[in-house]
């Protein structure tokens, strides 16, 4: 830092320069020092300005919290005063006097504190506001610029004169005096230096003595606050001493009364033998029978909870054992002491929850064959568990009643809205199991693994899952596909990872033979050593130098495996990534993933969130990933962040929360989600808007198996498969299509789709995991328009719409061949409709009964299948209703043109 100088020194040297020519040389020699000192002073002033900005922010926070404290004290005073009035109405004068006097004292102290907070705002906050205004700083900056300009002019003139002097020496001339020739430039520098020192001195005075004087005034206000509070306490102190003595005497008197009442109760019990009768009733009620009046739970505790309870064992010793328990979807799971044993799963619909009236921390759960005795940590925790159990039971009971199938026509299934997540979860779990490598354990190769690491997306066996649980949730979060109740969002990563893809990265350096990888018969010690090396040390992972630029590219390209490779090589997801060029600003990993996210990159965002994505890390502008999700309208990323417990109330540099940004940008869905999270009503499990791609395997044994795979997912009531004039009912092998007027149906009734034609294409199930608010994808329905011309019926789009539920026109969907499509033999006449005749009156519906229709296989046939088994069924000269893939046009074909699929 350049050497500092005093204003007095500058005044003395400048005065000497003005008074005598000899002082010009002295001032010229000190000009560089003066310039450097001015720059240093400006830097100090800027630093003080930043500190004052922090003080201003803290003072504002103290002022707002102080006002809140005053409001809470006022509510406390009102409650104490109400209690005193209550005792006064009961003629308890000593107690009422104590409560009322303490309420008055609280009011005085609250008034003093409120005055102190207002003084803080007036004495400290207002001067800070004037200091933070940019007028002083702008004037100082202008003076500094003028000073810099004068210095540059002086240097330029000095260089020019030096050249002239050198030229005069060469030519033999007489060089002039530099000090005299530079007098004007020197005077200009002195002028601007004076102006800058004036501005800087004014700023220093306001930031130093003036602000300190304000703090001294606030100190006096604090001194008065404590003095007045001490005086108020001293005036009440004699009364408090007398009150304490009288309250002690009153307590002793009431205790004597209670003791006498206890003795009287015991004597009455002995006389009337009430103890034996109560024991008899207790034994009777503690059996397997159910009480008529069920305990009602507190709805504030919700329907889901995970934690630890003490369960009384059934052995001879009957000791309390600590067990992990969880309530979800109307079921209670109780873990064992050994992690390899699957937990006990109890359906709450067949259970009854009974609080223990004597032990407030205990409650009983009565099932059909035994009674479980539980104990919580305290009474409040016990109340929470009892309420959650009862609420979950009530919710399951309501879902069961609402999901009953109606007796009227057109009803389909019993799930409705309640069954959609469960059906989708079953379908997604089957898809996860069919991923490459998921038929074997990711670590030991055991067959049929059923334990999922939700943050890594891999399947393991029950033995390896025990070691994963020992690692902790930081490395692996294990859930059971069969015992735990998973939501679609928890299967998001597993659907896009798989054991094979994961091990291609995490076991790339593993020797193919003789390596440390365990087998299905290995002991727990071998498994533990290998899993620690694989998941904690990343010893066998594919090696590469962590490059932030490569991770940036992987996130922008939605490359999940490249992100996994960076994670395996120790890339810190909390460090900012440089942009693709030097001009682009740096981005945090999670911020960038949320910013560029789309529907296909949700698994990548979920992976970063669950594996060290630093949910609450702030960017340079103070925005967290939650702010980015609200700013760029990413509601699905917002759901994943809220599932990861991101903080909702964090503010950025502008003082805005994520909810404020969503409101300002008019992103309604993000705003609703953040409001639910802020109010504590955010619903689990999550339903993200993701294209769930579910494959139908070509190895089905029968049409029933294939139909079960295709129709497992039930559609909501809003999506009707039957249009206004087309009535379709669907059974396993029976399709009835009537083009006449259908029976009117309510909006809540669902009609199933016609039986889809069997092929090995992939079925796209989209939008089934949306939020329960009704934001669901449209489902193509059969139109109610009149039949189209024969040309429209023979179009490829019409044929493909019968072959697959995918949208027509997709390049990946080739038209069916002559054996698979619908075709009409030459010479087949199509009857025309006369006026006033509907298709339902002219043609009978086509019925494919299960008795007359054989099951066909799409896989390879056995050699025993003879030609006789391949004879097609006889055709009937009746039409079959068809529709375009988008539901815009309908038509009919005679049954003679319909051929069953042949291999």
UniProtKB/Swiss-Prot annotation:
Coiled coil (UniProt feature): 141-172, 248-275
Arf-GAP domain ranges (all copies): 426-551
Keywords from the UniProt entry: ANK repeat, Coiled coil, Cytoplasm, Metal-binding, Repeat, Zinc, Zinc-finger
Per-repeat ranges for ANK: 585-617, 621-650
BP terms from Gene Ontology: cell migration; positive regulation of GTPase activity; regulation of stress fiber assembly
Disulfide links within the chain: none
PROSITE patterns per record: ANK_REP_REGION (PS50297), ANK_REPEAT (PS50088), ARFGAP (PS50115), PH_DOMAIN (PS50003)
Residue numbers spanned by region Disordered: 740-903
Expressed in which tissues: Highly expressed in primary hepatocarcinoma. Detected in lung, liver and blood leukocytes.
Compositional bias annotation for Polar residues: 829-840, 889-903
Major localization class: cytoplasm
InterPro entries (UniProt xref): AH/BAR_dom_sf, Ankyrin_rpt, Ankyrin_rpt-contain_sf, ARFGAP/RecO, ArfGAP_dom, ArfGAP_dom_sf, ASAP, ASAP3_ArfGap
Zinc finger (C4-type): 441-464
Low complexity biased stretches: 790-809
Entry-linked CDD domains: ArfGap_ASAP3, BAR_ASAP3, PH_ASAP
Gene Ontology cellular-component annotations: cytosol; focal adhesion; intracellular membrane-bounded organelle; nucleoplasm; ruffle
GO molecular function: GTPase activator activity; zinc ion binding
Residue ranges annotated for the PH domain, each copy included: 302-394
Presence of the UniProt keyword RNA-binding in the record: no
Cellular localization per UniProt: Cytoplasm
PANTHER family: ARF-GAP WITH SH3 DOMAIN, ANK REPEAT AND PH DOMAIN-CONTAINING PROTEIN 3, ASAP FAMILY MEMBER
Function: Promotes cell proliferation.
Protein name: Arf-GAP with SH3 domain, ANK repeat and PH domain-containing protein 3
């Amino acid at each position: 830092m350049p050497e500092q100088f005093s204003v007095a020194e500058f005044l003395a040297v400048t005065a000497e320069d003005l008074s005598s020519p000899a002082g010009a040389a002295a001032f010229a020699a000190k000009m560089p020092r003066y310039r450097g000192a001015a720059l240093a002073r400006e830097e100090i002033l800027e630093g003080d300005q930043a500190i004052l900005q922090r003080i201003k922010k803290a003072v504002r926070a103290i002022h707002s919290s102080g006002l809140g404290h005053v409001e809470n004290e006022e509510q406390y005073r009102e409650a104490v005063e109400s209690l005193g009035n209550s005792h006064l109405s009961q003629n308890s004068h000593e107690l009422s006097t104590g409560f009322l006097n303490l309420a008055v004292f609280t009011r005085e102290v609250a008034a003093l504190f409120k005055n102190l907070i207002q003084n803080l705002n007036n004495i400290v906050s207002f001067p800070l506001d004037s200091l933070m205004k940019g007028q002083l700083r702008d004037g100082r900056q202008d003076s500094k610029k003028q000073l810099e300009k004068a210095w540059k002019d002086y240097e330029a003139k000095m260089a020019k004169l030096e050249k002239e002097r050198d030229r005069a020496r060469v030519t033999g001339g007489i060089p002039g005096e530099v000090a005299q020739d530079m007098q004007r430039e020197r005077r200009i520098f002195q002028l601007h230096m004076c102006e800058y020192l004036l501005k800087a001195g004014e700023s220093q005075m306001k930031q130093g003595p003036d602000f300190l004087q304000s703090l001294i005034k606030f100190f006096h206000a604090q001194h008065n606050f404590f003095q007045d509070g001490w005086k108020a306490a001293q005036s009440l102190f004699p009364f408090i001493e007398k009150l304490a003595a009288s309250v002690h005497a009153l307590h002793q008197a009431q205790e004597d009364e209670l003791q006498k009442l206890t003795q009287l109760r015991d004597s009455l019990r002995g006389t009337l033998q009430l103890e034996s009768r109560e024991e008899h009733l207790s034994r009777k009620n503690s059996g397997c029978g159910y009480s008529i009046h069920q305990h009602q739970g507190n709805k504030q505790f919700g329907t889901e909870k995970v934690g630890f309870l003490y369960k009384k064992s059934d052995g001879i010793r009957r000791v309390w054992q600590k067990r992990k328990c969880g309530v979800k979807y109307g079921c209670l799971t109780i873990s064992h002491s050994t992690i390899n044993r699957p937990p006990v799963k109890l359906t709450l619909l067949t259970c009854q929850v009974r609080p223990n009236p004597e032990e407030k921390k205990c409650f009983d759960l009565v099932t059909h064959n035994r009674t479980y005795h539980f104990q919580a940590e305290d009474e409040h925790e016990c109340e929470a568990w009892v309420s959650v159990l009862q609420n979950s039971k009530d919710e399951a009971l309501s879902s069961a009643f609402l999901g009953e199938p109606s007796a009227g026509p057109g009803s389909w299934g019993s799930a409705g809205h309640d069954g959609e997540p469960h059906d989708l979860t079953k379908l997604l779990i089957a898809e996860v199991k069919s991923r490459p490598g998921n038929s074997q354990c990711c670590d030991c190769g055991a067959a049929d693994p059923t334990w999922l690491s939700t943050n890594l997306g891999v399947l393991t066996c029950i033995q390896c899952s025990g070691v994963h649980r020992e690692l902790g949730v930081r490395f692996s979060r294990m859930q059971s596909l069969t015992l735990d109740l998973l939501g679609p969002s928890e299967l998001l990563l597993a659907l896009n990872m798989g054991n094979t893809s994961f091990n291609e990265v995490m076991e790339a350096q593993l020797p193919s033979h003789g390596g440390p990888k365990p087998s299905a018969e290995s002991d727990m010690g071998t498994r533990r050593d290998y899993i620690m090396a694989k998941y904690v040390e990343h010893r066998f992972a594919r090696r590469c130098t962590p490059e932030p630029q490569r991770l940036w590219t992987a996130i922008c390209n939605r490359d999940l495996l490249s992100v996994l490779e960076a994670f395996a090589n120790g890339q810190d997801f909390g460090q900012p990534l440089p942009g693709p060029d030097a001009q682009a600003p740096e981005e945090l990993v999670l911020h960038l993933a949320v910013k560029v996210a789309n529907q296909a990159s949700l698994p990548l965002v979920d992976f970063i969130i669950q594996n060290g994505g630093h949910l609450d890390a702030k960017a340079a502008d103070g925005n967290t990933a939650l702010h980015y999700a609200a700013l760029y309208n990413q509601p699905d990323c917002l759901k994943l962040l809220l599932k990861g417990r991101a903080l909702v109330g964090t503010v950025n540099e502008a003082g805005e929360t994520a909810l404020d940004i969503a409101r300002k940008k008019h992103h309604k869905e993000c705003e609703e989600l953040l409001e639910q999270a802020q109010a504590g009503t955010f619903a689990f499990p999550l339903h993200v808007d993701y294209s769930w791609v579910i494959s139908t395997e070509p190895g089905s044994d029968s049409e029933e198996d294939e139909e079960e795979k295709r129709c497992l997912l039930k559609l909501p009531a809003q999506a009707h498969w039957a249009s206004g004039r087309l009535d379709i009912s669907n059974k396993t092998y029976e399709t009835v299509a009537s083009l006449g007027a259908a029976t009117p149906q309510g909006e809540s009734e669902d009609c199933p789709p016609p039986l889809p034609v069997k092929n090995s294409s992939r079925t796209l199930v989209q939008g089934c995991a949306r939020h329960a608010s009704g934001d669901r994808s449209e489902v193509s329905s059969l139109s109610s328009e009149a039949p189209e011309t024969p040309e429209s019926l023979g179009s490829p789009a019409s044929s493909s719409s019968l072959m697959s539920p995918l949208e027509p026109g997709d390049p990946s969907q080739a038209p069916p061949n002559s054996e698979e499509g619908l075709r009409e033999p030459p010479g087949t006449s199509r009857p025309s409709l006369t006026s006033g005749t509907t298709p339902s009156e002219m043609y009978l519906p086509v019925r494919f009964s299960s008795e007359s229709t054989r099951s066909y296989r799409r896989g390879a046939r056995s050699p025993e299948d003879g030609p006789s088994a391949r004879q097609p069924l006889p055709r009937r000269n009746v039409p079959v209703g068809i529709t375009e893939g988008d539901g815009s046009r309908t038509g009919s074909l005679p049954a003679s043109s319909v051929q069953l699929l042949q291999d």
